[in-house]
Amino acid sequence: MILRKKCISILLLTVLTASLCACGNTSKSISDSKDNKSSYSSTYNQNNEALKFDTAKWNYDETNNVYWTIGVQYCSDPESTDYETMAIYVPGEYMTGTKNSDGTYTCEINKSGEVNGYTSETAPIILPIDTPGYSAQAAPTSYNYDSAASYLKAGYVYVVAGMRGRSSLQGTSEDQGFSGGAPWGVTDLKAAVRYYRLNESLLPGDTDRFFSYGMSGGGAQSALMGATGDSELYYPYLESIGSAMTDADGNVISDAIAGSMDWCPVTSLDYANEAYEWNMGQYFTTDTRDSSSFKSALSKDMAASFAEYVNKLGLKSEDGTELTLSESEAGVYNNGTYYDYILNEIQTSLNNFLSDTTFPYTYTQGKIQIGNTASSGGGEGIDLSRNPGQGGNKDGQMPPQGQSGGRGQGAGMMQGGAQSSESKTYETAQDYIDSLNSDGTWIAYDSQTNTAKITSIEDFVKHCKEATKPVGAFDSVDLSRGENNLFGNGQSTALHFDSVESSLLSKNESNYSKYSDWDSSYITSFEDDLKSEDSVGTDMQTRVNMYNPMYYLSSYYSGYNTSKVAKYWRIRTGINQTDTALTVETNLKLALKNYDGVESVDFATVWGKPHTTAERTGNSTDNFISWVDECLK
């Protein structure tokens, strides 16, 4: 496979290295970043002519009063025009258009128009991210009003930016190969935001009011957009595709956003393996966790490593209690304030369900297929597969198994697809609780207060959140996980990235080698991959950091306070999902609530819901719009 490599200036990399060594809080508001000269210095020559928006290429949907345009190239040197263009959808009230001879329109901003209390100067700008399994989001090639209608009616500007996905793919001819994987997807989104800000005098919407949303891998990248604003780690990647870096006056252009909506974010991949084993894997002895496999021992060691990590994170609860784990007689580190906090999150989720639900209640069991997100909560959910970008591959679906090739098989990280559904109706809350307790009491229910208490995390997991992924849930020894593709680098389309797992394999070889399925080559495979660099010359650990929101939000990491973090956050997860540990979204919430400059964190886990756009009540589209309005009005 031939991949285009672009030269990155030595000066930029020198400045970048120096800046990363600096200490102190560099966080500023988004508006501040637009009004001040930047110390950004580089030999990069920005192609301003190529980055200027053409106001004469609008189209008009007279029926719905929408101005729209597609194929807007947001960088001057794209790796792939299949992905690195965007569509812009604007309520007609915000523009004044003059029809051209070819049927298109030349438009100017109309400052007097108003929709839902917003104007062309105050309207939020929405960025949908439909990237299940960190797959690509193809750029829109046609107009689709229905997918944007709710947002346009709310007075929002809707921007669908194509973005590369987790794999290094080959184009239709040999010279069209391009780099994918981390951090190229988020790089593309940042370039789209920067392009819009460069052209803000020509485009409607308040560029201080970018809000992203996504589910699963899209939720993860939405979280990254919220956490990595203006991170200098992305500069060489942005330059390599010809992104807008400075405006006409030499001011640095920000890629920070105002708000991030994240459903079931599969993120924090540096400790995702270990979190999965602590939260779920340690309680099971089937499949790869069978006692005959070395992975049963690895599972326990991973769980213990997660506890060590938690004890260094410095997480605090809402009342200021330091959250830590301690050893326990049963299980791996099933003690401490952190354990109690996670147990309380589970209990709160159940009690919210009891409070929200009117009985008789019908429960439908069955997992939603990723890429075709169905209803959540009490109504219809956001169907991310119907976004104008079409998500996933160009057909809007997950990449087929094995697409990426290489040493791994390219299996999707969230596969399983739709399962047959079974429905059951419960007449009362007591009937529902009795059903959950059918094989032993693990929930105590008080009908007078309509509240419940749960005995342990283990009981909850065994009944509602089974470990369906193998040991090495995100980085397996055979390189078969989707995340292994995410950290491929062009030369190898699947690579190991978990340094903790690598250390455990090396440190505990004498124990693991007692098992018949042990292979000493696992150690060298991990060690070699962790030394690899991508086409920009970035090492594996840095790439992992760039795709970890906690790297920017927690003082445990050197990236703390090196980015402009979004002010507004909303996180929802189906607590029954088996795709990732409950600790992932919980740690993200805790870090955000303790981060200076974050104004609000709206968080909930949704009882009985799987890996989907889960909501306690209502539907995800309306709830998202209501939340954005609450943040801004």
Describe each PLM feature range.
Residues 19-22:
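C-terminal motif of bacterial Sec signal peptides marking the signal peptidase cleavage site
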Residues 28-30, 34-38, 368-427, 487-488:
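Disordered, low-complexity segments in secreted/periplasmic proteins that are enriched in proline
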Residues 30-122:
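Catalytic-loop region of hydrolases
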Residues 93-150, 570, 577-587:
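Short, surface-exposed "cap/lid" segments of acyl-processing enzymes
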Residues 128-186, 228, 608-613, 619:
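Cap/lid segment of the alpha/beta-hydrolase catalytic domain
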Residues 178-202, 620-626:
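Alpha/beta-hydrolase active-site loop
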Residues 198-283, 367, 374-388, 392, ...:
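Primarily recognizes the serine-hydrolase "nucleophile elbow" in alpha/beta-hydrolase
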Residues 574-577, 600-622:
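Histidine-bearing beta->alpha loop at or near hydrolase active sites
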